């Protein structure tokens, strides 16, 4: 499933939307979300840390297990273990930032293949 969601990620107003996404992505099983804050790297480490923490808190609050994958901020997009972590997700969530940067960081990588 692919869901393109504009701004507002991790806000209280998005709980119902994200709960529906989790339900549809994982069915009756427990949801496992991978949050990828790569698009925020140009805004600095504190912004990456903020998106990481917000995403983890938000989806854990919805009952999902959460793995934050910091591609470009300590983790490689071509690392097979990173790709495996992404492939294990029932929902992959790319948080806010610069979409063009995200595209350049992931295009043609093992991480992107795992997301598809």
List the predicted regions and their residue ranges.
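Extended, subdomain-level signal for the structured scaffold at the beginning of enzyme domains
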Residues: 1-101
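Glycine/threonine-rich flexible loop motifs
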Residues: 99-109
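Catalytic-core regions built around general acid/base machinery
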Residues: 85-88, 108-116
């Amino acid at each position: 499933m692919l869901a393109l969601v504009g701004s507002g990620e991790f806000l209280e107003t998005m709980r119902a939307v994200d709960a529906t996404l989790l339900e549809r992505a994982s069915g009756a099983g427990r949801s496992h979300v991978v949050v990828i804050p790569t698009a925020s790297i140009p805004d600095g480490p504190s912004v990456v840390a903020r998106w990481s923490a917000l995403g983890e808190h938000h989806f854990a609050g919805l009952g999902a297990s959460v793995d934050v994958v910091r591609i470009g901020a300590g983790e490689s997009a071509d690392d097979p273990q990173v790709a495996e972590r992404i492939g294990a997700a029932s929902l992959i969530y790319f948080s806010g930032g610069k979409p063009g940067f995200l595209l350049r960081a992931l295009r043609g990588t093992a991480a992107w293949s795992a997301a598809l």
